[in-house]
């Protein structure tokens, strides 16, 4: 499948075949591709993934997730989180193999960009999570899987349920598996002229 086909065929699947399973090794391969090839600001790779396989944990998440069936019925459920402090805790590790001069420049730039700027820190993890989510869903589509990005849930209760570390934030959930039934018709999209402006507003 080429990229444009994956983009056109991907839909937010609401109903999954609960009997369909994805072997753990295939889950791992899918995630490894997304982890390896998704871009992120300063290559900080802000994302942290919680893959929820346990049936009881899925049921608990569904209770605080507006009772959405994707949470329990999909073959793979990921709570996509991000480390707010990664700019400080991991930057030297991430850039350690770079040319020393480049490494020093990048580490200094990261520090200047993020330090004492909580809004920037949060904005960046959400941007990176969005890039990761779309990459993962397109890779899943290429493998013949359906997916659904989800944010209809109680973030505070999900955080309690998964024992979220204090320096992490929940970005969204992603359900992956085999859809069943026909998807709803696509809703209309904004016109090109309404969505796109050249040079200035």
State each model region's role.
Residues 1-201:
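Acidic, surface-exposed loops and disordered segments
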